[in-house]
A protein has these predicted regions:
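Extended acidic/polar, glycine-enriched regions
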Residues: 1-28
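Beta-propeller blade termini and top-face loops
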Residues: 33-186
């Protein structure tokens, strides 16, 4: 009797593929507000200050590691702990910067690039394309756009930055290849 129950799968509504691929409720509905500061215009440029959050509701350590911008001026910020944030209010005044967590759990993201409105992230183990399928401001699907076959646990083995060329190719810098070590990325 017990054996037959173990072999018969139960039907669950959550097993429906369409249900699983249409997004879901917000996981991080909170936003964080900071204030930026305009820099003095000297010569050809000014250095503005974008203040990062002092703390978050998730108590994560906020160490910025990547930055890019949407065409509408919103900023995308990655942090070393695995988060991707979207920052609104990056304008001429910088009076109200609104930080919204877009994705979490990425493996040491060190580069981010917005292409055609989609966010791509360079992680230690892959290039990830983030999808917000229900347009609620959070990534619902993390697509492995390109997996890295040379992943090291070495602390200094990072995949830095993320750039594209006019043909749509992606480029990043991979450290740790100038040694004689048998450990990849060491």
């Amino acid at each position: 009797m017990l054996e037959s129950r173990l072999n018969e799968p139960e039907a669950h509504a959550e097993d429906d593929f369409a249900t699983l691929t249409t997004g879901g409720p917000l996981r991080w509905p909170e936003t964080i507000k900071t204030v930026g500061y305009r820099g003095l215009e000297q010569g050809g440029y000014a250095l503005d200050t974008i203040t990062i959050p002092d703390s978050t509701p998730w108590n994560n350590w906020f160490r910025t590691s990547a930055i890019d911008f949407f065409d509408d001026g919103r900023m995308v910020v990655g942090n070393y702990g695995g988060d991707i944030w979207i920052v609104s209010g990056v304008d001429d005044d910088l009076l109200t910067l609104i930080w919204k967590r877009f994705a979490a759990g990425l493996y040491e993201p060190m580069g981010v690039r917005v292409v055609d409105g989609r966010i791509y992230v360079t992680c230690k183990d892959r290039l990830t394309r983030l999808h917000d399928v229900d347009n609620n401001g959070e990534a619902d699907f993390y697509e492995s756009f390109s997996a890295d076959d040379d992943v090291s646990v070495n602390f200094h083995a990072f995949n830095f930055d993320l750039q594209t060329d006019n043909e749509g190719n992606f480029y990043y810098a991979k450290s740790g290849h100038g040694t004689d070590s048998d450990v990849p990325g060491a």
